[in-house]
């Protein structure tokens, strides 16, 4: 491992996490133009245990490119799975196949056995196949013919879906949505960003990008260990809880966010603090992630089911109205 890569867990510090995060984002931005805020939120999830990500946006907005670029910059193995109605659980988990040469069955591991999995158009797969992915996301293992096999560490699922296509899709069940740490929209580039995309492609003279690995699997694990040391004041913890609980009392919400939503806020806020070279969380860290961490966990009242923005409006309202703690002093 070269000197720029993250040190092992015994030596890594908050400053190491911040410096490495900057290098990772710079590397990803060699392929992805703009969208720095989205990229940093995705990195915060990648540096959090259980940081699965749902990208919901229109085709052609670099969702696949983002996932692939992060895998390269993080030095992690990457597999893309195109979800379709005829995709079977065994197609993603693998199974035992008969080897005629050896006269015995041997294990053929499926594409789930990688560090970063791009589950493209996840809502096009059948519920049975979705449930196989859910087990992997939840347990970090798969079961084949009664045998339990551990998945690589780290294991991160980046799933995509189109927000307007419903024909021929199987909406993700609430249990699976709740397993995603955050849900993000990439958004269209600005005019200048779109022109920059064209300029880079013209000068590169090919579609492919060449990105280097800033760290590796051991480095990501070391960064996660450092993030676990970030201090969270009890008042800030209470703020996370009150934001989450407020979703259950809102007039437009039928079912609010589970405690897993508060845990997502905790993990993401700590990761962001470390990326900002802080060893403590501030309320603004929580506010930053509230929409992405909570919106997809809400089940709205039936009259709002067709309003795609309603859940986000609820969270934005709660961010404005729930009392924000004032910290007397920070950890240092």
Task: Spell out what each predicted region is.
Residues 80-112, 168-177:
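Conserved AAA+ P-loop NTPase core
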Residues 2-11, 15, 247-332:
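C-terminal engagement/docking regions of AAA+ P-loop ATPases
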Residues 41-45, 98-118, 147:
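Conserved alpha-helical scaffold flanking the Walker A/P-loop in AAA+ ATPase domains
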Residues 57, 120-121, 132:
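Walker B catalytic acidic pair
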Residues 58, 92, 160:
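P-loop (Walker A) phosphate-binding loop of NTP-binding proteins
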Residues 14-61, 241, 245:
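Pre-Walker A (pre-P-loop) alpha-helix and adjacent loop at the N terminus of AAA/AAA+ ATPase modules
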Residues 46-84:
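Walker A/P-loop
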């Amino acid at each position: 491992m070269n000197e720029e890569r993250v040190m092992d867990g015994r030596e890594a510090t908050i400053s190491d996490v911040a410096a490495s995060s900057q290098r990772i984002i710079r590397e990803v931005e060699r392929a992805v133009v703009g969208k720095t805020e989205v990229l940093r939120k995705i990195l915060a999830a990648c540096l959090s245990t259980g940081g699965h990500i749902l990208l919901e946006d229109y085709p052609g907005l670099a969702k696949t490119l983002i996932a692939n670029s992060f895998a390269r910059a993080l030095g992690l193995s990457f597999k893309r799975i195109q979800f379709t109605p005829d995709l079977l659980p065994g197609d993603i988990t693998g199974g035992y196949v008969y080897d005629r040469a050896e006269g015995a069955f041997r294990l053929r591991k499926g594409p789930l056995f990688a560090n970063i999995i791009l589950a493209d158009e996840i809502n096009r797969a059948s519920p049975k196949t979705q449930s196989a992915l859910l087990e992997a996301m939840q347990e970090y293992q798969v079961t084949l013919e009664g045998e339990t096999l551990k998945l690589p560490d780290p294991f991160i699922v980046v799933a995509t879906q189109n927000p307007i296509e419903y024909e021929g899709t199987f909406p993700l069940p609430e249990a699976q949505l709740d397993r995603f740490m955050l849900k993000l929209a990439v958004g269209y580039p600005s005019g200048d960003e779109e022109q920059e995309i064209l300029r880079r492609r013209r000068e590169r003279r090919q579609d492919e990008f060449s990105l280097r690995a800033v760290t590796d699997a051991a480095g990501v694990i070391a960064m996660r260990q450092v993030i676990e040391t970030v201090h969270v004041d009890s008042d800030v913890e209470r703020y996370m809880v009150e934001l989450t609980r407020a979703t259950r009392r809102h007039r437009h919400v039928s079912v609010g966010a589970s405690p897993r939503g508060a845990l997502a806020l905790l993990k993401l806020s700590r990761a962001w603090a470390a990326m900002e070279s802080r060893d403590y969380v501030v309320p603004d860290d929580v506010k930053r992630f509230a929409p992405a961490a909570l919106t997809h966990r809400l089940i709205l009242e039936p009259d709002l089911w067709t309003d795609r923005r309603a859940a986000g409006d609820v969270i934005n309202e709660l961010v404005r109205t729930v009392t924000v703690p004032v910290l007397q002093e920070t950890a240092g």
